[in-house]
Amino acid sequence: MTWGRKATGVLGIDRAIAFTVLGRCWAAFSLPVTLFCVVHFLSVKEQDFYFTFDSLLALQVFFDLGIAFVVLQFASHERAHLEWTADGRLTGDPRHKARLASLLASANRAYSWSATLLFFCVLPAGFFFFRSCEEAAQPAAWRWAWASAVLVTALNLRLSPLLAFIEGCGRVADIARLRLFQQFLGALLSWVTFAWGGRLFAAPALNLGFLIVAALWLWFSKRRFLRDVLAARDNAVRIRWRQEVWPLQWRITVSWLSGFFIFRLVNPVLMKYQPTGTASRMGMTTKIIDAMSTVCASWMGTKAAPFGALIARRQFAELDRVFFRTLKQSYAVLLLGCAAFVAILAGLIHLHHPFSSRLLGLLPTCLLLGNALMGILVNAEAVYLRSHKQEPFMWLSVVSAFLTGTIAYVAGRYLGPTGVALGYFLLSLFFGVGAYTYVFRKKRRAWHAAA
């Protein structure tokens, strides 16, 4: 066995994780290039707009309503009773295939409405907010860029249930490979837009790359599969959305809506109340930390569908074995990433490199990294429990959202980024890890004992 194979075995890198990590590594490579373009091609005020675009586009969670995640979980439980054929179809118990067809049709209808509502609600909301931050002498070039960003985001939202459904049906590696190509084309389109003087249009260009890749892949690679599933619809055998899906979905919805206040509120507050450039420094620093966290979350994220299948088969010992092994592997990678980031930032500050002034200082950065380390544990526990088609973290998410939103507003308005970072760290340390882990251990014992 070669050294490379030993390393991938120790780190638990299967095909799905490999594609996912490649995509995240490409994102990690492309992120510095994108940040360089942001600094080089945009004014300081435009940088605030650029990063706040991203925060406001996260309002899509109010229209996604967690349906894609629920679709993935329910698809994985039904697919556990079916098998893939050589020509890319699902075969087996007709009842479970009919339930899959019902799930897909319902998700399609829901997202047609959600994408439309997103466009017509988020577009004017952004206009209202950015006009309040617009300087009198500043050109309004951001308006068309914002409209384009909202349109592309809405179209991506429309396709998201199809991708979640396919992933839930066991094609985790295929979706991971798709994400890799999306990251690649999105970054290239963004850079070209910067280079050609597109300025803020680079923001929608990134998501346009995602849209093009997903639309082409679905049309040329998965069209027949989706049609075959829909052809199995049987009104006598269908998923009863209100009785089966809704009890999980509304809890996921509340948790995901809470996520906006947990992760996205701070940049608009900093842009509104702090000096020009503060929001962009927070945005750049959190972009880097989020990229590292997302790489490490790949280990656990690719296990959502397999976890659902193991639970459907009542293979709880194997479920726990894979979960705890995967958690250790993802933590090891994140610790290495955090150490590397701190070392690089300290070096930039020591050398008085101009780029260091575009990032937060060492203290707030280390606090945000500590928060990310605690967040990876909470994320893993959430993946595990939600794979049971349950959402026990809903009320914790609501409390976290209230406390985080309060910190973001008060500290963001009066104390700046260091106050925000300290508040986030203390909240995760004294509330997040303890409360979420308590619920995780309690529910894990109860659910498996009942089975």
Show where each model-derived region lies.
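Interfacial segments at transmembrane-helix termini and the short loops linking adjacent helices
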Residues: F127-S148, T276-S280, A317, A343-L373
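Helix-loop junctions and terminal segments of transmembrane helices
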Residues: L65-D93, I289, S293-R314, S387
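Interhelical loop/hinge segments that connect adjacent transmembrane helices in multipass membrane
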Residues: M1-I13, L200-N207, L216-F263, R314-A317, ...
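Signature of the first transmembrane helix
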Residues: G12-H77, H81, W250-G277, S428
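Transmembrane helix-bundle signature of multi-pass secondary active exporters and lipid flippases
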Residues: F53-L65, S255, G259, L265, ...
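Hydrophobic alpha-helical transmembrane segments
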Residues: R143-S148, A176-R227, L403, P417-R441
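Membrane-interface junctions at transmembrane-helix termini in multi-pass inner-membrane proteins
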Residues: T153-R179, F201, C366, G370-S397
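Interfacial transmembrane-helix starts/ends
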Residues: D14, F51, D87-W113, V245-W246, ...
